Amino acid sequence: MEFLNQGDQASLLANTSNEHASLMLKQPLAWSPLAEKQTVKTIVHQTPKQTGRPSEPDWTVWLDKVRWVFGYGSLIWNPEIPVVRGLLARVDGYHRRFCISSTRYRGTPEQPGVVLGLDRGGRCHGMAWELVAGQEDLALKTLWAREMRNGAYRAKLLKVKLPSGECLNALGFVARREHPNFLRLREDELLRRLAQCRGDRGSNQDYLANTVHALQHHGISDQKLQQLLKEVQAQRSN
């Protein structure tokens, strides 16, 4: 797995023009209280079945709003979008939870897996990724095809807090409790899915393990996920 740590960031800046690097470091990380109110209702529409792609208005409306993306699960260890740097960040009012059914990436229609969502309450530590200027359209297209395929998430600008105390606006994908794919699994069923299910992108156990290891790499301790991983590994070894 590749991570954008401080060494990577220094290397990236060293290979960037002095003018561009200076601009990246001096730009304000501004947050507006209006950000949390901004959601786009068109995003809840289902992906057109004939193309398998999200409709353009779903992501183009964000082009002038999004400079940062908040990752709390696989977007930490596999963002798949052009980014300049990643910063440790925290979102209040939401927590990371296995609450979204996965019938493609980590499961199948016959054996659905489960992936993470931002659910109401608590707080969530993750990564804020700064998008490469001029490539926002590519980043958003990629994110919509990946995260918004079945409408189980709602795209929302979140107030993201940095360790420095600064705040910024970041696009996040929040679980939609009203969606059929939103789950409230019993612990035994959650463990079963994590231990047994597999989809186009690999096993559910790998998804969990990669997330735990990525969080630890960045100095984030999620004890709930760490305990889940221990129990899943124990279940698989029996």
Regions inferred by a protein language model and the residue ranges of each:
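A glycine-rich, hydrophobic/aromatic-adjacent loop/helix-cap motif
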Residues: E2-N238
